[in-house]
């Protein structure tokens, strides 16, 4: 979390660890995914590349990466389209929790799923169902350095 150009770490150094909050209720979510942290249904078990891949595999019995699922969606494969629509709904619900608490100007998405072109419009369209406001002013943008943004950020923070 960055406020006025300064990284906010918090007293425990975990500020921004949004992925280990519980996934909120969204339509079609079938709870019960175990996270590596030992808890069930952490946000990152649903709205990450591996989470998207797990959702697709559960519904299609085929193991594909998030990129492969996105490519199938672009080519018109209906199962990929349905799974991505569910994913966008889940991501909107999860991001709404951040917006409801912080009301940030911008949310920056990184990692492989940030390359899914239709994600940004689809998620923004769905946010209104979950954000406690009549107007959602938060922008959702792709990280400037794409897939490598997390690694670059970690290297930048290294003492």
PLM region spans:
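Short beta-strand scaffold segments in enzyme catalytic cores
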Residues: 1-2, 21
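ATP-binding/phosphotransfer module of carbohydrate and carboxylate kinases, centering on a glycine-rich
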Residues: 7, 25-159
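Conserved catalytic-core motifs of eukaryotic protein kinase domains, centered on the activation segment
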Residues: 13-14, 120
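A short, polar/charged loop-to-alpha-helix boundary motif
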Residues: 14-29
